Design a protein with these regions (language model features):
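Extended, folded cores of ATP/NTP-driven motor/assembly subunits in large transport
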Residues: 1-390
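Conserved small/polar residues in nucleotide/adenosyl-binding loops
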Residues: 391-395
């Protein structure tokens, strides 16, 4: 039976060109370095250590060049524990310990980091101009070999800063780990299969106005893409009441409700877009002057001017770097009833952080496409919000 729906091949729309020397090169000549990230064990980090980890990330981001994208992708996939009984010298107690957890369900966590060098024009593009809708033109800026060399040097310095912190370990992914081999599926193939294991077969991707499917799995997407959706105050960590007492605190990261505390198959994506901070601040200065001129016609314009002025005052007085950011949770299930429960769980976890949960159905295909390893530069600019990165020497 012929498929009457409008269809195309993945090859014709695939945004990546090649993998060379451990870097992913897109058809728009964006260069991406990929890492596997080893994070501290949950429930073992103190409040002071969370502050130190946050400061280390800020220091590392500062060394990246303008028009770079940091994409941190945390995978949480339901699996069942399989004991390793083939180790040599295993005694009775060790074997009993392994068998005690046999087939016990758990949430498998993998963390990846993608650092992308793109161009000014690419960072400004919106969802109606991504690689799902157009062809490819290589920007003149990215053709300069010196640009690529400086970016790789910055990436190495970035990794060194995080590895020297003692809390986070980065391991550069090889070409085979990115593209895969005859025996192992690479992370790009795993993303299209929504699986951390080897993909047995290729899955069809269906995009409709109501939902998006990858094989039998239906996707649901919740986004944090506006400052109005964020809580009034954000911290590096929070108290976990279930394991805390009057005398001791158990600390978790502020975003832990979207990580291991969310018991479903999901990916937590975090994006930081690093542009030219001085240009961004000058653009805000111009916007503030326009709002001042229009304030007599609308009180909302006057309020917006005050917010922009406060943002500029903070940035200039404290030496903050202007960046854009976006966060989303992409969950999936092959069962329609379970997906309804997952939607409620994700929304309630976001609400527990003080955020306004936004179930985004319109941009799910576009954001799924931008989440492809090495394709973060294809992210739609209108889905991000402006914020600041601490730029002081003790950050």
């Amino acid at each position: 039976m012929r498929n009457i729906m409008k269809a195309t091949t993945l090859e014709s729309r695939f945004p990546l060109l090649s993998v060379e020397h451990g870097c992913i090169v897109s058809k728009d000549a964006d260069i991406t370095a990929a890492f596997e990230v080893e994070l501290p064990e949950v429930y073992t980090v103190t409040a002071e250590e969370y502050e130190g980890i946050h400061a280390t990330w800020c220091k590392a981001i500062k060394v990246l060049p303008d028009h770079s994208v940091l994409h941190k992708q945390d995978w949480y996939v339901k699996e069942r524990y399989r004991p390793d009984l083939g180790k040599e010298g295993m005694g009775f107690l060790a074997r009993s310990y392994e068998m005690h957890f046999n087939e016990r369900p758990f949430l498998h966590h993998k963390c990846y980091l993608f650092l992308t060098k793109t161009t000014k024009e690419r960072m400004r593009q919106q969802s109606n101009w991504n690689t799902l809708c157009r062809g490819h033109i290589v920007p003149k800026e990215i053709q300069d070999k010196e640009t690529a060399v400086k970016f790789i040097e910055a990436v190495e310095q970035f990794a060194r800063i995080l590895n020297d912190s003692g809390h986070i370990k980065l391991r550069r992914l090889s070409d085979d780990e990115l593209t895969g081999t005859d025996k192992e599926t690479g992370i790009i193939g795993r993303y299209f299969a929504l699986s951390l294991g080897n993909a047995d077969c290729l899955e069809d991707i269906e995009m409709t106005a109501r939902e998006m499917r990858v094989g039998d799995n239906r996707l649901c997407l919740h986004t944090l893409s506006d400052t109005e959706d964020l809580p009034a105050a954000v911290a590096t960590d929070c108290r976990y009441e279930r394991l805390s007492t009057d005398r001791s605190d158990c600390r978790l990261s502020f975003a832990a409700p979207l990580g291991l505390l969310l018991p479903c198959n999901h990916i937590y994506n975090q994006y930081v877009f690093i542009g030219n901070s001085d240009e961004e601040l000058r653009r805000f200065e111009k916007t503030a002057r326009n709002m001042q001129s229009l304030s007599r016609y609308s009180r909302q314009n006057a309020i917006n001017r005050e917010w922009i002025e406060e943002y500029l005052n903070e940035a200039h007085s404290q030496g903050l770097k202007s960046v854009r950011a976006h966060f989303n949770v992409m969950a999936w299930s092959d069962d329609a009833e379970e997906l309804k429960r997952i939607k409620n769980d994700v929304g309630s976890q976001m609400a527990s952080m003080g955020c306004v949960p936004r179930h985004n159905t319109t941009d799910c295909p576009t954001l799924f496409w931008a989440g492809i390893p090495g394709n973060a530069a294809d992210f739609p600019a209108e889905e991000s919000f402006h914020t600041c990165l601490l730029y002081t020497s003790d950050a």
